[in-house]
Amino acid sequence: MQCIRCPAILALLALVLCGPSVSSQLDREQSDNQDLDLELRQHWLLERARSAGLLSQEWSKRAVEELLAQMSLPEADVQREAEDASMATGGRMNLERSVDSTNNLPPRERKAGCKNFYWKGFTSC
């Protein structure tokens, strides 16, 4: 009787000990995925700022950290903060032009007889 109990107890003990490690491994993988998503988002935000010319200016380390913290908040928090800010300003909203312009306008057509500057001198169009 004890011979049958011993392997059964060992099997149950092995299941109990292996159970938390599997769930903790899943938690670690989810945490790693969230960290990777956050790093990718911050990299994307830095690239947008660089393409907009914002990184050519002098920024203090604290200002950059605050900017990244605000931009990495979930969208619901950002909308809630925007609503709070609009209530604080009396409901007025200042609109700004987006960095990623989807409105790609063709370049101006040059008039006949116009002159362009070339490094050797002026040339006609």
From Swiss-Prot:
Somatostatin inhibits the release of somatotropin. Residues 82-107 are annotated as: Disordered. This is Somatostatin-2. Its main location: secreted. Belongs to the somatostatin family. GO terms for cellular component: extracellular space. It holds the Pfam family Somatostatin. It comes from the Eukaryota. The keyword Ribonucleoprotein does not apply.
